[in-house]
Amino acid sequence: CSEVCVVAVISCSLQSKLEAAKENGIPVVAFDSGVTDSKMVRAFRGTDNTRVGEIAAYRLATAIGKMGKVAVFSAQEKTQSIQERVSGFTNYITNYPDIEVVEIVYQDQVDDMTAAMQEVLDKYPQLDGVFCDNADIADLYLDMKKDETKDSIVMVGVDATAKQQEAIWNSKEVGVVSQQPYAMGYQTIWTALLTTAPKKSVEIKRNVRIDPAWIDSSNIDDPTYSSYLYAN
């Protein structure tokens, strides 16, 4: 094996494998999430997840008139990419003093995420908006059976899944902050190939963060953004 590309949900989950790669002189390129800060990783290629949260905060704040109550429905609390999205969102939303983040719910901290989200909707009948910070949570929220009084809640999601694209077309979701999986994969493989070159012949930038894009009804059919749309 001459090089390894890895993605970790939780940064500590690959520690032993990273140590083994280092001992055997195998360069490691991390992509997407999980091990960006490890000294055992030669390079990282992935989305700027802090920016994902910031864009979501700006778009949600704008959509609800820069005032009101919002909730964050999140995935694994220990996942680095999710941590960055949540912190990006909560830090940016402080620019709007009339907006209150009333709840942050993590899927790995509850027994039933659908029930937990419904509990938030029931607890805050005047909730104005929600940020679903990954594709699975967004799709789960869209699948929930909600009464008509909840139709006015503004939703912003992450990654333009087929279900979220349909929700945007049907005005059930204001928009989605989407990653570009092709660019992420291309950058990762290209960087892995560069690690096989003589050390002094190429310069490999340690961290490359790929900007996400905002997708809504105004640009979802624009071919320019087709690489940000997911088939499933």
Residue ranges and their predicted role:
Residues 2-23, 28, 89, 102, ...:
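Hydrophobic alpha-helical
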Residues 12-51, 69, 161-174:
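Flexible loop/hinge segments that line or gate small-molecule binding clefts
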Residues 92-96, 186-232:
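Hinge/cleft segment of the Venus flytrap/periplasmic-binding protein
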Residues 45-70, 113-114, 160-164, 180-200:
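Hydrophobic alpha-helical segments within soluble ligand-binding/sensing domains
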Residues 3, 8, 42-43, 69-77:
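Short beta-strand segments enriched in small/hydrophobic residues
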Residues 69-74, 90-110:
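Short beta-strand elements in bilobed, periplasmic/extracellular small-molecule ligand-binding domains
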Residues 40-47, 76-79, 102-105, 126-128, ...:
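Second-shell loop/turn segments in exported
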Residues 52-59, 80-100, 116, 140, ...:
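Short, solvent-exposed amphipathic alpha-helices that sit
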